[in-house]
Amino acid sequence: MTNTLDANAAPAKPDPEPTRVKRWIVGLTGGIGSGKSTVAACFQEKGITVIDTDDIAHRITAAGGVAMPAIISSFGGDVATPDGALNRQRMREIVFEDPRQRKKLESILHPMIREISEREISLAASAYVLLAIPLLIESDHPRERVQHILVVDCPEATQIERVMKRSGLSEERVKSIMAAQATREQRLAQADAVISNHGNLADLQAQVDSLHEDFLTKAETWFGASASHGGQSPP
């Protein structure tokens, strides 16, 4: 029997999307071993929301992660550990020497990472958001999602020493990873602000303190300009 009420009723209007408050976003980046995580933790201690795209990538490639079915379908079952998580060592071997395979992996991960990070940004309550993207400068449009770029910088010799100490990788392996990233000069050329992370923690904290105050002012100014443009990002 046909339900004439349903058949003749006007289509239901979709629920309105929740209001998303525009956020002033600082893109945090730096080379491997530069100390991005330490800097991010300093900002978190000040109550700033930090969204780490590396952390999101680990979450979606853990056992049961939303990215794993597509990854296994594209690369085969040997890229997964017995519990269903991504075998990171195996995947590194596949994508490091083959740009096509790397692009394939990125085509799976990047849309998911972006969707999750955008959702988390929309829920942030802090005056501004720190969006940690290790390969921000290497992306095609580094300023597409951020209003300000903060680079964590240190000498390349310091990077190598730190990564070897924490990971056990050989010096040659660390250098090969660094060679696949933007150069120190390329990152600094794109930076709106720089944290020099080759001193002690007190020096690092002092730099964060100063930048935090500056970012609060910039975020307030930007938000006021955004409001005057009807909620759109100011030019």
Question: What kind of feature is each model-predicted range?
Answer:
Residues 55-128:
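ATP-dependent small-molecule kinase phosphotransfer cores
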Residues 68-72, 156-164, 171, 175:
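An amphipathic alpha-helix signature
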